[in-house]
Amino acid sequence: MAAAALLLLAAAAAAVVVAMALRWLLLLGGPAAGRQGKRARMPPGSTGLPLIGETLRLISAYKTPNPEPFIDERVARHGGVFTTHVFGERTVFSADPAFNRLLLAAEGRAVHSSYPSSIATLLGARSLLLTRGAAHKRLHSLTLTRLGRPASPPLLAHIDRLVLATMRQWEPAATVRLMDEAKKITFNLTVKQLVSIEPGPWTESLRREYVKLIDGFFSIPFPLACLLPFTTYGQALKARKKVAGALREVIKKRMEEKAENGGSIGDDEGKKEKKDMVEELLQAEGGSFSEEEMVDFCLSLLVAGYETTSVLMTLAVKFLTETPAALAELKEEHANIRDMKGKNQPLEWSDYKSMPFTQCVINETLRVGNIISGVFRRANTDIHYKDYTIPKGCKIFASFRAVHLNNEHYENARTFNPWRWQINNKLQNAVGANIFTPFGGGPRLCPGYELARVVVSIFLHHLVTRFSWEETEEDRLVFFPTTRTLKGYPINLRLLSESIC
């Protein structure tokens, strides 16, 4: 068995090397290169080492708390738009806010969304991230219908209950890994919105598999990975099958219930508010969504709801802890809200709108943390920008991080300063220039961005009005394969004497 496994691994590695070698030869002298002609000039840059390009340099930089030198050195040498070679492909890297805006707005015309094959396989071809054109438009519209209305009283009440239920499980003097706790909140909230299942053994089992699935996003997709379960990608494929199977069972049951009711969801089919995303899908467009479409769609929404919002919650607490003046002002804002409401009254939309400094904190956490570092696009046609021509088929990476942390756009850009977002601050003009893009933009603007803000705001409210805390050990940020803290940000909690948790 061991010998067979080694043979399979060797075959997989050989296949990867051959595929990368062929891709390298095509990039150097294939048809695309011939089409460029003498007049077409790619942005300057370096393709690095044969086969691997600059991939190892990029990964090495992004596995540190300070990946900026990778970008800074190339921008200083080549300008805000440069060529590199990462993840097996020549890629144009943009740190230019104007070009980034062009790319975001041109989705579906000059460019289309394009991600590594590992992500595409694990999410599914019908996921919100990977669909294009009319298919993406209808999925995006459905997501907005369900997740783009955070002012809904039932949704606000559920978020409030879920956050408090999680915090009540913490001991009065507990040590917790905040990122793990935040992920429980966001995962359970997303599952509730998708399939109306409350936290319990089913959701926890699903979450454990989902962690394995996400770990495989930026791993090497070996051709025989399905036969190599000991690899990260092989484990992710296995987890994907389990997650999809669990979602499929729920969806199939709901489809059967609809059929038994003569094509209706139930007695309340005519009600304006659908109970979850599956119900939205079953009734949308005359019930035209297939079972596989619904599975892929729900699976991809779990990624959006689970990973990014939980990291935002954790980084907000980390940055506040490192900036005592900001934490003090945030505590004052939320103490005032609690004093006006009373200790046991749930938060409402009017309370959320009374958190201006909280929104400054969230904006600054998004800007400094860059939970989404940027987006991949692929050119549908030759793109002419300044003196350069980016040929059809070329991959492009629009870096939000490079823009957000550039001192030309933000004063002391690499310092956490939530006051820069106050309305009377001149640096607020940065938003008007459309260079602040933590949720993307254009047709692929994140449909749940306002909901994410609401969840983080409610979480911060209950945290600062019920607990004090301190870091138990130093924990640092890394940005590959995703933005996170290495240790999950462990903190010691102390229940405030006047709080009722």
From Swiss-Prot:
SUPFAM superfamilies: Cytochrome P450
Names of the cofactor(s): heme
Transmembrane feature ranges: 2-22
CDD domains, alphabetized: CYP90-like (cd11043)
Entry's EC annotation: 1.14.99.-
UniProt-annotated binding residues for heme: 446
Family recorded in the similarity comment: Belongs to the cytochrome P450 family.
Protein name, per record: Cytochrome P450 90A4
Species in which this protein is naturally found: Oryza sativa subsp. indica
Gene of this entry: CYP90A4
